[in-house]
């Protein structure tokens, strides 16, 4: 008999293939590999607790590569500071970090919200070619909206 989790992942794999979303299909392939080689019992708890941090670290490394290669240096930083786009990007970075902080609080106090966030991320990745950067930012946005709603109650 096929387990519910295997069936669920298989359905998501089909959605990923239909949507031609390589990130989703590779992620599910890795999960299937871990699950069917019985490494899942050891690796899944680690990925569940540390996976987002690992992902953020990999993304951060990718973003910093142009600095490491010398493609971006102090000259480019100075030129960027003259652009209002750079100041918008700076403000956006601050806003996202603050939203993520609220998201951590929400996930801590209301962990069942994670299910809705995961489904929202899956829908965006599978159907709209979104990028799964999601639970912390998603929960941060949810926290901000919920806080605004609470102010008007």
Swiss-Prot record:
Q: Where in the cell is it found?
A: Cell membrane
Would you name any one GO CC term?
plasma membrane
How does it sit in the bilayer?
Answer: Multi-pass membrane protein
Q: Could you tell me which Pfam families the record lists for this protein?
A: DUF441
Which keywords annotate this record? Cell membrane, Membrane, Transmembrane, Transmembrane helix
Q: Which residues cross the membrane?
A: 8-28, 54-74, 87-107, 117-137
Record family assignment: Belongs to the UPF0756 family.
What HAMAP family is this protein classified in? Answer: UPF0756
State the name under which the record lists this protein: UPF0756 membrane protein BCQ_4399
Q: What is the organism of origin for this protein?
A: Bacillus cereus (strain Q1)
């Amino acid at each position: 008999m096929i387990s519910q989790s295997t069936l669920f992942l298989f359905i998501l794999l089909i959605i990923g293939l239909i949507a031609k979303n390589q990130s989703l299909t590779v992620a599910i392939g890795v999960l299937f590999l871990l699950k069917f080689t019985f490494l899942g019992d050891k690796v899944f708890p680690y990925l569940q607790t540390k996976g987002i941090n690992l992902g953020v670290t990999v993304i951060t490394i990718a973003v910093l590569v142009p600095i490491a290669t010398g493609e971006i240096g102090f000259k480019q930083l100075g030129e960027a500071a003259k652009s209002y786009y750079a100041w918008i990007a700076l403000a956006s970075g601050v806003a996202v970090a603050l939203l993520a902080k609220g998201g951590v609080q929400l996930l801590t106090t209301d962990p069942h919200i994670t299910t809705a966030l995961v489904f929202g991320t899956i829908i965006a990745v599978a159907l709209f070619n979104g990028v799964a950067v999601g639970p912390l930012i998603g929960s941060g946005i949810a926290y901000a909206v919920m806080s605004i709603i609470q102010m008007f109650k």
